[in-house]
């Protein structure tokens, strides 16, 4: 499981906070493009050197052009507001799952080298992590900040735009003058060059070798809902998933 996130550097609004089963650049780009439907396009982004950010960086460079410097890269330690967010995400969301998974491993319930166990873990817990992240994001974006006169991050984000409502800042005009935007051609330059982006940090998350058919997937989702309550922190649901999917393999062996 991989967590990808983005925070607005001015207001501290969490723009997106997602859990997925891979660390691929297209996954991050999908989260970014989904977020701009709510928060619109930023004028500039700051990322670390991870290759998972390469498509977002390419997208921004293609949209604004290389000369406007829309992408700043560097060690994440310099991105202090994002680092503070990650600290709280771990403390209030991820540490619970972190401890739970280690407990499952210590009790021989989870074998991290077993593909079936990893498949079941992702099936049950990715939706649960997503729910927890969504709830955290809602609370974070609406909590009062003493440094901002007790305005929430979302209030600060909104106030920031209207403070500069009379300016010609592109990012402000894009939000306030939505009727003037041609969304069919917004940010598209078919004749522009594709920028070359170099990165030095590459974390590879291998994909599961277990691939269920559509019929098997439907049977699994009908039988076991990841978010249903089992009064065991999802452990019983995980064990049921292991047994249920294992039956598919037993059936394949018998039929062959």
Q: Which stretches of residues belong to each language-model region?
A:
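Hydrophobic, mid-to-C-terminal alpha-helical segments
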Residues: 128-180
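RNase H-like DDE/DDD metal-dependent nuclease/strand-transfer catalytic core used by mobile genetic elements
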Residues: 1-150, 207-256
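Polybasic, proline/glycine-rich intrinsically disordered low-complexity segments
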Residues: 170-209
């Amino acid at each position: 499981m991989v967590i990808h996130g983005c925070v607005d550097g001015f207001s501290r609004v969490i723009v997106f906070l997602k859990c997925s089963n891979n660390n691929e650049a297209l996954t991050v780009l999908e989260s970014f493009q989904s977020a701009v439907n709510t928060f619109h396009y930023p004028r500039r982004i700051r990322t670390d050197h991870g290759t998972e950010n390469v498509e977002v960086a390419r997208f921004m460079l293609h949209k604004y052009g290389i000369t406007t410097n829309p992408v700043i890269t560097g060690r994440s330690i310099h991105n202090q507001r994002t680092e503070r967010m990650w600290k709280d995400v771990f403390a209030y969301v991820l540490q619970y799952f972190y401890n739970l998974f280690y407990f499952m491993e210590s009790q021989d319930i989870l074998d991290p080298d077993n593909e079936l166990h990893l498949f079941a873990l992702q099936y049950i817990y990715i939706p649960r992590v997503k729910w927890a992240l969504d709830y955290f994001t809602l609370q974070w974006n609406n909590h009062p900040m003493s440094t901002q006169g007790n305005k929430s991050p979302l209030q600060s984000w909104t106030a920031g735009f209207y403070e500069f409502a009379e300016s010609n800042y592109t990012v402000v005009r894009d939000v306030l003058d939505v009727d003037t935007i041609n969304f069919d051609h917004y940010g598209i330059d078919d004749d522009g060059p594709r920028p070359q982006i170099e990165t030095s940090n590459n974390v590879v998350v291998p994909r599961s070798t277990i691939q269920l058919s559509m019929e098997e997937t439907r049977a699994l989702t009908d039988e076991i809902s990841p978010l249903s309550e089992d009064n065991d922190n999802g452990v019983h649901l995980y064990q049921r998933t292991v047994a249920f999917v294992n039956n598919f393999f037993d059936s394949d062996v018998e039929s062959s």
